[in-house]
Amino acid sequence: MAVNWVDINVDGETMEGYLTQPAASGRHPAVVVIQEIWGVNSHIQSVTDRLPSQGYVGLAPALFHREGRMTLGLYEEMDTALARLGRCSDANILADVRAAVAYLKAQPNVDPQRIGIVGFCFGGRVSYQSVCNIPDLKAGVVFYGGRILQPLGGPGPAPVEQSAALSAPLLGLFGEEDGNPSPADVARIADELNRHHKTYEFHMYPGCGHGFHCDGRASYRHEAAKDAWAKTIAWFNTHLKG
């Protein structure tokens, strides 16, 4: 496996990205990995590191690049992370994801027709929003995406209000004890997807709260995380390799 930090052009600005690649030659499917509010920290890097062994190129773009490099891995810095999130906008986030997808499409070892996205927490929201706005994405996975029901950095629309435009199969993985998104939020999102006849699967994990996949958080639940990751790879295998 090859690992690098790369520079990605976003409208003339530089966004860092954590890139992992299989050792095998040829063109591979690729997955954009979207951070939690703490940036491309050790957890997000470890997720991206898992992809090459499954035959995928992985790329985790640093979405807070407009504010400079963020200290990585300090989960106690909630106020700092939330302040940065509050200064984000949906327009900038979509520009960043489009740039990450364009970067992958330009790589000689990536099949440009087989790119997916997975996101965690804030990144789950970004993943949902992205598959509603970027047709180049052929599969999406949302891990406990908060604030899907609200716009960010402007009057709207919220990601859930863009569900009619969702253009890729979507997998959602949620904790039954989570408050953001709550089970009621997840049900509302599912209702909207059903209303528009979209292809999706949602799984609710009993006894799990927010962040159950992240082994750096007290909310980590090993068995649920293991099962959710297996479902993630199976989803990508079906929709990016099938």
Regions found by a protein language model. Name each.
Residues 1-242:
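N-terminal cap/leader regions of alpha/beta-hydrolase-fold enzymes
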